[in-house]
């Protein structure tokens, strides 16, 4: 699985700036999705062929009477303890603060590899920046400027060397004994463990690997209606007797890793609770990772007609950027709606892995343009000439032509909807990439 790097520090030391710099390559993928909040605390970065997950743990502002452990949210502590590397950020301009010492004392006890990073060091000599922070006892400080990018690449490369060294050997994704990899994600108490038992059943478990530590994943291989699946369990599920129970401990780190490792994600919501920012953040990460998605709205049997209408309206309003995914209203406890949910899992996986022939893509593009041409931008009208597939999981459609920088987001969504309709691409994000050339020979040879 992708290693996790946790960003830690008191408020206003530049964690968000560093987070944005580390994840900037991913932001553009979801920035134009209507309804998706940009206020995220986790994302993906990549250095060469090495991807990693980043968690911004928020700011710590300890007060004397409570101490640092009381000020740190449970989720923050858990994220730090489960991360592969902790990047502890301090402020080079303002120097060492009492809060820094409190945080350092806590971090030393976690046993995690810690990188002490002095931010806002632009224009300052290293000795002047670093001297005070040796007092924290966390080794040599690394001076960076998150705002300007100075020193960031070297720092993250060092962190990844440590993070990847601790990663177990990757399982073979092409192993024929493994079926579609499914991650069931959601807040605590939405019914994840109940859904697992409804899917697997007491006699359907083929293999169960008990983790060596709480930071490992559990893979459960099972069959349903003659099809093979692999459940990636990062929700704290443990087997008790012949069934699974949930240790109700929501883990951001485990959720991110399970989404990254999955072929299809089931986002489980509680019909009896309003959709939260946490639900939307998880959903946004699924889209950012390009994972196929099915939405399960659980505990549907407990609602009257009025409450059901309200729940559907809440889903449409708050998660409208997931309009490509099918929603199923289920009761995991009563095992109603599970069959249809799993059929959508199969369909979403098929759509994510679909092969789209160039002639058919180009024909669909031409028909879309003939039905509705892109708007002019000044004297220029974009010319969309042909399309081909650039990747799978999620499908990537590359469109070639002239002046494609002038294509609006609205027209891009129009094309996406046309491609979805033509090729039945339900349940998967779809990427469209434009490649302009004013040189008629640029796309040849």
Curated annotation (Swiss-Prot):
GTP 2 binds at residues 186-193, 233-237, 298-301. InterPro entries: AAA+_ATPase, G_ENGA, GTP-bd, GTPase_Der, KH_dom-like, KH_dom-like_a/b, P-loop_NTPase, Small_GTP-bd. Pfam families: KH_dom-like, MMR_HSR1. The keyword Iron-sulfur does not apply. The keyword Oxidoreductase does not apply. Keywords: GTP-binding, Nucleotide-binding, Repeat, Ribosome biogenesis. GO terms for biological process: ribosome biogenesis. GO terms for molecular function: ATP hydrolysis activity; GTP binding; ribosome binding. Residues 3-167, 180-353 form the EngA-type G domain. Gene3D superfamilies: 3.30.300.20, P-loop containing nucleotide triphosphate hydrolases. GTP 1 binds at residues 9-16, 56-60, 119-122. Residues 354-438 form the KH-like domain. Belongs to the TRAFAC class TrmE-Era-EngA-EngB-Septin-like GTPase superfamily. EngA (Der) GTPase family. Associates with the 50S ribosomal subunit. GTPase that plays an essential role in the late steps of ribosome biogenesis. This is GTPase Der. It comes from Burkholderia ambifaria (strain MC40-6). The lineage of its organism: Bacteria, Pseudomonadati, Pseudomonadota, Betaproteobacteria, Burkholderiales. The gene is der.
